[in-house]
Design a protein with these regions (language model features):
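Transmembrane beta-strands of outer-membrane beta-barrel proteins
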Residues: 21, 33, 87-89, 198, ...
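Conserved small/polar residues in nucleotide/adenosyl-binding loops
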Residues: 277-280
Length: 280
């Protein structure tokens, strides 16, 4: 047995200051409206801080963060009654904006979970995805040869070590003509911009029927499983996207799906935007 997380005897409680303003009113015994606005600031927030690997741990929990949340919530409910029949409906929508205010003097922190790197940065939401950005696939050997041109100003695409035709290209974020970890950038967040829901309930005497729907919009989901099933490796199953894979220069597919292969080459197995799903 061994501890999975480093202990910290100096940990304390998080502190939150919050202001909430609300408005609620009804009309004709049929309609009910609710509107809430809130702002909160959490200090001494518990965050996992990277530590030297010789400690035996990658991170240690510390009270160093300050984060603000601001948002609005709205709901509308209706009640209709005709004799023994009652029909109730409710719709709600909310939006929250999260921002890191302070990290104990640091500007940013990186943490990695299940091969996905997250960046927590002052002025940004907590836990943005921090990945490479795919830029289609190399259509032919000529594009790869061009990416190796000694005159980097002539390169159409950045150099990817070990890449073959049909392998992923990536955007050269730092502009040095080569793809490496310095080309990672913020590529989205798991927190939705909007959360909404709708429910309806119908009652007649002792019978009732209820339906409830919920959804989110504007967030991204990292699907690590795609790293294997969308990598077109021979030892794994594939999704229907495989039909759009690169086959040859004359049959490039959609230009977004890598070639079929026995073992990934280039940086096809690297965590990138190809693993991120965007909600509608």
């Amino acid at each position: 047995l061994y501890p999975s997380t480093a202990g910290n005897p100096d940990l304390g409680w998080e502190k939150t200051a919050m202001l909430n303003l609300g408005l609620e009113f009804g009309l004709f015994n049929m309609f009910t409206f609710e509107l809430d606005w809130y702002t909160s600031t959490t200090s001494d927030m518990l965050l996992d801080v990277p530590v030297a690997e010789f400690s035996g741990f990658s991170t240690i929990p510390m009270n160093i963060g300050k984060v603000s949340n601001k948002g609005i919530e709205f709901s509308l409910a209706t009640t209709n009654k005709w004799g023994d029949f009652t029909w109730n409906n409710r719709f709600n929508i909310s939006a929250n904006r999260n921002e890191v205010v302070d990290l104990g003097g640091a500007e940013e922190m990186l943490t990695t979970t299940e091969s996905v790197t997250f960046i927590t940065k002052v002025g940004e939401p907590i836990g943005n995805y921090y990945t490479l950005v795919t830029d289609g696939v190399f259509a032919n050997q000529a594009e790869i040869d061009n990416s190796k041109d000694p005159d980097k100003t002539k390169r159409k695409y950045a150099y990817v070590e070990g890449a073959k035709p049909g392998d992923f290209r990536y955007k050269d974020i730092d502009g040095n003509g080569e793809i490496n970890e310095n080309d990672r950038t913020i590529t989205g967040n798991y927190m939705p911009k909007f959360t909404y829901g709708f429910s309806t309930e119908m009652k007649y005497k002792n019978l009732d029927l209820a339906v409830s729907l919920q959804g989110v919009q504007g967030n991204k989901i990292a699907n690590i499983f795609r790293r294997y099933i969308d990598n077109m490796e021979g030892g794994n199953n594939c999704q229907i996207d495989a039909l759009d894979r690169w086959v040859s220069e004359d049959d490039p597919g959609s230009g977004l799906v890598v070639r079929a292969n026995r073992s990934a080459t280039g940086m096809n197995g690297t965590t990138s935007t190809c693993l991120l799903y965007t909600s509608p």
